[in-house]
Amino acid sequence: MRENRPVIALDFPTLEDVKAFLAKFPADEKLYVKIGMELYYAAGPEIVRYVKELGHSVFLDLKLHDIPNTVKSAMRVLSNLGVDMTNVHAAGGVEMMKAAREGLGDGPILIAVTQLTSTSEEQMRDFQNIQTTLQESVVHYAQKTAEAGLDGVVCSAHEVAKIKEATNQDFVCLTPGIRPAGAAVGDQKRVMTPADAHQIGSDYIVVGRPITQAEDPVAAYHDIKAQWNDQ
């Protein structure tokens, strides 16, 4: 189920910024993009419709976490938008995740967030009061996600092998925190290069600033895509 296109995180504040960025790419180049909270809350459903009308694939990254019925209803709305992928927080529980699957239907990919890539083991223990290792926590959440009937998880590339071993090889692992060699790590605590993620078995990678803030975003995208596909 591996996706050969890096997923571009559209971390922009407005629809106009997105339009300007996407206009840099040839019209026949179909991208896979991530729309997160900032952009969705600023532009609303229109941003999803606009990107889909251009023929691009959309990962709507809202990380839903609420009571099962509320999440189910919200997912039904997102399904009508035509998103290709969306997510919930695994910490919401198995029943919530099952409700999300029911609301979204069987078409779009539904994944769960395990531990954010900005979370360190020290933070997890001190703030969340989880006294296992970070990797054990992530694998536990992944197993519960599979039990709920979801397609996969958001996880660091460091946990991919253990997750697939604990679930199955078709279980989707989407990896944020990807940076080309030599790039600044920003606010991500656990990062890897596109080539590393390829070797370790990630199915999707998410790349933001190294593409969106590059002097030549199209060239940066193609370079990262080549690294991701081990070319």
Swiss-Prot record:
This protein's record includes keyword Lyase: yes
UniProt xrefs under InterPro entries: Aldolase_TIM, OMPdecase, OMPdecase_AS, OMPdecase_bac, OMPdeCOase_dom, RibuloseP-bd_barrel
Domain of life: Bacteria
Matching Gene3D superfamilies: Aldolase class I
E.C. code: 4.1.1.23
GO terms for biological process, alphabetical: 'de novo' pyrimidine nucleobase biosynthetic process; 'de novo' UMP biosynthetic process
Gene Ontology MF: a single term: orotidine-5'-phosphate decarboxylase activity
Ranges in a coiled coil: none
Cellular component GO terms held in the UniProt record: cytosol
Binding positions (substrate): 11, 34, 61-70, 117, 179, 188, 208-209
Associated pathway: Pyrimidine metabolism; UMP biosynthesis via de novo pathway; UMP from orotate: step 2/2
Record carries keyword Amino-acid biosynthesis: no
Active-site annotation: K63
Enzyme class: lyase
Protein keywords: Decarboxylase, Lyase, Pyrimidine biosynthesis
Matching SUPFAM superfamilies: Ribulose-phoshate binding barrel
Pfam families the record matches: OMPdecase
Record's catalysed reaction(s): orotidine 5'-phosphate + H(+) = UMP + CO2
Cited NCBIfam families: PRK00230.1, pyrF
PANTHER family given in the database record: OROTIDINE 5'-PHOSPHATE DECARBOXYLASE (PTHR32119:SF2)
Record note on quaternary structure: Homodimer.
Function: Catalyzes the decarboxylation of orotidine 5'-monophosphate (OMP) to uridine 5'-monophosphate (UMP).
Family: Belongs to the OMP decarboxylase family. Type 1 subfamily.
Protein name in UniProt: Orotidine 5'-phosphate decarboxylase
Protein species of origin: Streptococcus thermophilus (strain ATCC BAA-250 / LMG 18311)
Organism lineage: Bacteria, Bacillati, Bacillota, Bacilli, Lactobacillales
Name of the gene: pyrF
